[in-house]
Amino acid sequence: MTETDGQKDNNQDTAQAAADPVVSKPYIMPDDPEEGSNEALVREAADARDKMLRTLAEMENLRKRTQKEVADARTYGVTSFARDVLDIADNLQRALDAVPAEARANAEPGLKALIEGVELTERSLLNALEKNGVKKFDPKGQKFDPNFQQAMYEVPDPSVPAGTVVQVVQAGFTIGDRVLRPALVGVAKGGAKAAPSDGGSETGNLN
């Protein structure tokens, strides 16, 4: 083959290549949906919604727990202090109980003023305690309840149902819905059996 022939062949090949169309592969966008991608997206959305709902539920539970802890701290934060103050209330009550009714009726002005001062002090102390959620209760006449009272002795008394509180040695106190100090009581025996209480416990009269 001569050099001229070789050049002709090359020229023919080049011309043929130029004449043939160039076909490229189609470009697929990275985010084009693939087979089954709709189901995957639905599952992901459902999982995300489930996680969001669980997170919201946990946040709501945390909020409620926090509110309860704050409320309990406000209500019961004075428990230790209130328990100490009860001794003062007891001493004031003992001082008043030590004065017979006849002596009060015939008391001289000075003694009468002293008694009234002690009574006023006791009322002020009980009011201050009540403002902080501490309430005094007297269960006399109520059916004995071990949740709120402590029986010190039994008293033969057939005139009332057995198990009735007939004497209160020491008043009880509650703080919030808890017993700060149970009442010390005497319970009747010998009478008819007390009827069962219907429902919640009775603390007696709250003062």
Swiss-Prot record:
PROSITE patterns: GRPE (PS01071). Residues 1-11 have a biased composition (Basic and acidic residues). It is found in: Cytoplasm. Pfam families: GrpE. SUPFAM superfamilies: Coiled-coil domain of nucleotide exchange factor GrpE, Head domain of nucleotide exchange factor GrpE. InterPro entries: GrpE, GrpE_coiled_coil, GrpE_head. One of its GO terms (biological process) is protein folding. One of its GO terms (molecular function) is unfolded protein binding. Residues 1-39 are annotated as: Disordered. One of its GO terms (cellular component) is cytoplasm. Keywords: Chaperone, Cytoplasm, Stress response. HAMAP family: GrpE (MF_01151). Belongs to the GrpE family. Homodimer. Participates actively in the response to hyperosmotic and heat shock by preventing the aggregation of stress-denatured proteins, in association with DnaK and GrpE. It is the nucleotide exchange factor for DnaK and may function as a thermosensor. Unfolded proteins bind initially to DnaJ; upon interaction with the DnaJ-bound protein, DnaK hydrolyzes its bound ATP, resulting in the formation of a stable complex. GrpE releases ADP from DnaK; ATP binding to DnaK triggers the release of the substrate protein, thus completing the reaction cycle. This is Protein GrpE.
